[in-house]
């Protein structure tokens, strides 16, 4: 989840000047598929959150040897509530980071030199959920209601959707600061609650309905997707330091990293059972059932992609940038140099040359059985 990140940014910018020539991995590697003598290029990937299927493609790329095949020795660092990927990358402790696009734009707006090089999630997983028996079956119906949402930057997609439906988030609804769980919703203390399709939505479905003794189902809920409201700002993407990617050798490393990572996501699309086991082998906090649901939902955010996995859609970038400036995430309009699609396109072309399906046009999401407590 996103967290407020302004307090650390000034210090991080100082660290960047110091850490540009040091820090994680083979920071200033140049060229080839490893150094002379066959050594691999060492790089670090900083995840946005803890180990879970949200990052399955990267774990699969490592487990299946795809990074090795590209001459890379990749260290995957888990995230958490006190870890800001932008801070880690700017400080030189990782070459690659994963975060939502509006967080990247916010960091750039404060002169943080980072750039998106691959937009892995092609669509947003952010929703508001309501109970079916409430009759609140649209964003417009939330006027005058208690609406839960995570604050600290997570609220902007919802606020954009409310405004689009003529609802002022400051006066026409009661915004409730929602913890990173669904207890307020399950206890009916809010009329609507924020939920990612791949996480909190499952947390509701994994609970028992006290009226029936059975697990809740989607028939009990209205799921209002921000992507269907036209306010689905882009989420997980890969970013690097701007000065790092200017080096030609690092450009080669970035292309190889993306090729292997994309191949990992293709593996997870086409071999979900094996991919799930790879995630479980890396020790996630939540159980197998929850991870199975999450992997399926994450695949829905990636596939299909007409441009090829990881290639930024300029229109979606513009939507995210507009939401960011409308709601004060950034003060200055985002420029198109906030992302570079060169390396993602090169990785996609290399995979196509190997016969890989980089679009997933024919992929259909399987039906995943919800398990009690996500076990």
Segments predicted by a language model, with ranges:
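A bilobed periplasmic-binding-protein/Venus flytrap-type ligand-binding module shared by bacterial periplasmic
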Residues: 60, 126-136, 234-251, 305
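Conserved C-terminal helix/tail region of periplasmic/extracytoplasmic solute-binding proteins
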Residues: 318-375
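Short, glycine-/small- and polar/acidic-enriched structural segments
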Residues: 34-187, 191-198, 218-220, 224-226
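Bacterial N-terminal signal peptides that target proteins for export
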Residues: 1-9
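Bacterial N-terminal signal peptides
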Residues: 10-19
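Secondary-structure end/capping motifs
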Residues: 248-331
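Pocket-lining segment of extracytoplasmic ligand-binding domains
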Residues: 102, 180-183, 190-285
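Bacterial lipoprotein signal-peptidase II cleavage site
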Residues: 18-36
């Amino acid at each position: 989840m996103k967290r407020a990140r302004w307090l650390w940014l000034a210090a991080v910018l100082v660290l960047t000047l110091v850490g540009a020539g040091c820090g994680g991995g083979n920071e200033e590697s140049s060229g080839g598929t490893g150094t002379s003598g066959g050594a691999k290029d060492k790089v670090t990937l900083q995840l946005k959150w803890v180990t879970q299927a949200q990052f399955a493609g990267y774990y699969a790329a490592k487990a299946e040897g795809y990074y090795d095949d590209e001459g890379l020795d990749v260290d995957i660092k888990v995230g958490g509530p006190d870890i800001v990927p932008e801070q880690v990358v700017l400080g030189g402790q990782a070459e690659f980071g994963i975060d939502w696009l509006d967080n990247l734009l916010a960091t750039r707006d404060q002169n943080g030199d980072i750039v998106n090089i691959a937009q892995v999630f092609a669509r947003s997983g952010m929703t508001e959920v309501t109970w079916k028996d409430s009759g609140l079956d649209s964003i417009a119906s939330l006027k005058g209601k208690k609406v839960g949402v995570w604050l600290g930057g997570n609220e902007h997609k919802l606020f954009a959707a409310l405004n689009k439906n003529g609802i002022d988030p400051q006066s026409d609804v009661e915004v409730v600061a929602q913890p990173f769980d669904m207890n307020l919703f399950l206890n009916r203390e809010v009329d609507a609650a924020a939920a990612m399709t791949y996480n909190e939505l499952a947390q509701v479905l994994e609970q028992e309905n006290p009226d029936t003794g059975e697990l809740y189902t989607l028939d009990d809920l209205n799921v209002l997707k921000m992507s269907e409201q036209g306010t689905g700002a882009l989420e997980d993407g890969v970013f690097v330091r701007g000065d790092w990617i200017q080096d030609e050798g690092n450009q080669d490393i970035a292309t190889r990293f993306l090729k292997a990572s994309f191949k990992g996501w293709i593996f997870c699309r086409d071999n979900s059972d094996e991919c799930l086991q790879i995630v479980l082998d890396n020790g996630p906090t939540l159980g197998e059932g929850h991870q199975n649901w999450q992997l399926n939902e994450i695949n829905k955010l990636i596939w299909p992609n007409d441009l090829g996995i990881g290639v930024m859609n300029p229109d979606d970038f513009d939507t995210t940038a507009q939401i960011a400036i409308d709601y004060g995430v950034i003060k200055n309009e985002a420029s198109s140099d906030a992302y570079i699609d060169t390396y993602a396109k090169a990785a996609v072309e290399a995979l196509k040359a190997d016969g890989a399906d980089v679009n997933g046009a024919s992929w259909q999401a399987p039906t995943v059985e919800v398990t009690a407590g996500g076990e």
